[in-house]
Amino acid sequence: DMASIQTAAGLTPYVQFGEVQWWYFPDDGSGMPFYDAYTTSTFQAQYGRAMTVITTNTIDPATIPQEASFLPGLIGAFTSQIISYVRSAYPYCRFEVLYPIDVNDTPLNRVINYPRSEWTSANLNCLKTESFTYTYNRNLDLSRTSIEAGGAFGFLSAERSHLVGISDPSTAWLKEARIAEGYGFESVVLFALDQFCLIGYSLPLSRGMRRSLWQG
């Protein structure tokens, strides 16, 4: 539907897979998200056994090699099927993945939430990274690791984007955006307009405090 709307408006359709992953929060009591009927039955059919009970996202994925292969495969198959379906009607449609680096910074999440065979620069036009936790924790060193992460996945600077969460002036979101701009990405995106308006920022945004001194 989105590709159709964009095409009707005279645009080249551009579709995002927004945070397509296995979400897990250790403090909300929901447990691991792998055990719905479809996932468990598909795993059983493929491997002839029940999926291992995984209790934490800090587990070493090498100890569960079949699950570590199967789970990202489902994500990759899902996005690949959508790409094929949409491009059958809109062959010039462009696709990007929004990938949150911070919430995947655990041994298991790094493996199961990035299907390396499918999420490549050959299949996607852009990889967009984000890391709101690093921004809100005021850690520019970690924000930089998020900004740079796409290179390790094989995406050139022109094939990458970075999403920055707008926050109050005590966080370093503007500095993070300027750092990302320095890498020559396709885009640096500020999220979101409602935050921008509620806080009351004005345009143009600050380019940072700079001083120059000439001593002749």
Name each region found by the language model.
Residues I5, Q81-A89, Y114-N123, E148-A149, ...:
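Alpha-helical structural signal in soluble globular domains
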Residues A9-P13, Y90-F95, F155-A158, G184-S187:
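Loop/turn elements at helix/coil->beta-strand transitions in domains of secreted/extracellular proteins
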Residues W22-W23, W119, W173, W214:
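A residue-identity detector for tryptophan
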Residues I59-I64, R94, G154-F155:
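Generic detector of short, locally flexible boundary/turn motifs and exposed helical patches
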Residues L124-G216:
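Substrate-binding cleft of secreted/luminal carbohydrate-active enzymes
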